[in-house]
Amino acid sequence: MSLPATAPAAAPVPKMEARHLSVRYGEKLAVKDISLALPERQVTALIGPSGCGKSTFLRALNRMNDLIPGARAEGEILLDGESVFDRHIDAVELRRRVGMVFQKSNPFPKSIFENVAYGLRVSGLKDRAALAERVERSLVNAALWDEVKDRLGESALGLSGGQQQRLCIARALAVEPEVVLMDEPASALDPIATAKIEDLIHHLKARYTIAIVTHNMQQAARVSDQTAFFYMGDLVEVGPTEQIFTNPSEQRTEDYVTGKFG
C-alpha cells in the first residue's frame, strides 16, 4: 500500500522583504533590482567584496540611506507585509522596529546605564524602576550584565572594544526592535570578543530577525541560516548557508566563497 504524499515544507515566513529594490547615490546605481526576503527569527548573512552594495542594501531596510544627501530608493521594502515607504510610516519609529548596530562601536560619552536608557527616555519612559528593569534586561540579552552590573554609573568609554559593541547591541535591544541589522559588528574586534558577538547572535535569533553584513566567510558560515552573495550591486545568489558554501549554483559565488577573488 502506498503512503500518502507528504506536503512540501512551507517556506519560512519573511519578516522583511525587498522587492525589485534599487538604490542610487546621485547618478551612481549602488544596488540593482534586488529581491530578497529575511525569514522571521533567522540570521541572513550578506556577503560580497567591498563596494558590492551589501551595506547599502542593509541601510535601505530601515531607511538609513534617507540621511545621505542624493540617495534615493526605488522598489519596495515590506515589514510584516507593509511598505516602509508609505507616507504614514514614521522613519524614527521604523528605526525603532528595525534597529542597527554599526561596524564601529559608538557609545555615548555617558554612563553605561544612560547609554542603554537613552532611547527609552527619548521614547517617553520616565519611571525609574521601569527604566532600571529595561536596562538590566537589555544588558542581560546582550550578554553584558554580569560584566558591568557593579559599575553601571561608570563611563561607557572605559569598556573594552568588545564590551562597547555589546553595549551598543543592548542599546538597540532596549527599545524592543523586531529586526536587528548588523553592519560588520565584529570586524574591529579580537578573536575572543568576536566569538562572544557570534555566540550572542545565536541567542538573539530566538527573539529577533537578524541581517548581518560580513567580510568574514567563516563567520557567515557559523552564524547564519541564509546567505546572500552580492557582486557589483547585483544579488547573484541566495540560499541556505550550507548550500551557498558547499554547493552554490553560480560560479561567481563559488569563486568568492573559496577565496579566488574578493
From Swiss-Prot:
One of its GO terms (molecular function) is ATP hydrolysis activity. Gene3D superfamilies: P-loop containing nucleotide triphosphate hydrolases. It is found in: Cell inner membrane. PROSITE patterns: ABC_TRANSPORTER_1 (PS00211), ABC_TRANSPORTER_2 (PS50893), PSTB (PS51238). Belongs to the ABC transporter superfamily. Phosphate importer (TC 3.A.1.7) family. It is an enzyme of class 7 (translocase). ATP binds at residues 48-55. It catalyses: phosphate(out) + ATP + H2O = ADP + 2 phosphate(in) + H(+). This is Phosphate import ATP-binding protein PstB. Transmembrane segments: none annotated. Its EC number is 7.3.2.1. GO terms for cellular component: plasma membrane.
